[in-house]
Design a protein with these regions (language model features):
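Short, well-structured N-terminal submotif of metal-dependent ribonuclease cores
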Residues: 1-44, 56-69, 93
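Active-site neighborhoods of divalent-metal-dependent phosphate/nucleic-acid chemistry enzymes
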Residues: 2, 78-100
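An amphipathic alpha-helical micro-motif enriched in hydrophobic residues
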Residues: 9, 49-50
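Anion (oxyanion) recognition and catalysis
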Residues: 33, 75, 96
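Short beta->alpha linker loops
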Residues: 44-45, 86
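Active-site-proximal, substrate-binding regions of enzyme catalytic domains
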Residues: 50-78, 85, 90
């Protein structure tokens, strides 16, 4: 079974929008790709990230073009969304493997 990591929405936003620690987030993401680590996320993840991008636009922290570009890049980032049943089982298996 290849290694997996569950991605947090705040990390994904840092990949898409210049924020403090965006460079570190990009380095981390790239290292996961290079190490062939599968990026997984819960079912609500895409909605949480899209909502954050939209909120930044509404609050005028992003231009319309920046928001559109961030969303477009988000759709091609490369992560696997797990539905709740699969996510629950995966979390259980990961905890078991880690001895948690």
């Amino acid at each position: 079974m290849p290694p997996k990591i569950c991605v947090d929405a705040s990390l994904a936003v840092k990949l898409l929008v210049q924020e403090p620690y965006s460079d570190q987030a990009a380095s981390l993401w790239q290292s996961w790709i290079e190490k062939d680590i599968e990026r997984i996320a819960p079912a609500f993840f895409p909605f949480e990230v899209a909502s954050t991008i939209r909120r930044k636009y509404v609050r005028e922290q992003l231009t319309k073009e920046e928001a559109e570009e961030a969303f477009t890049v988000f759709t091609i980032l490369g992560f696997t969304v797990l539905m709740p049943e699969a996510l629950l089982k995966e979390a259980w298996n990961m905890a078991r493997e880690l001895g948690l």
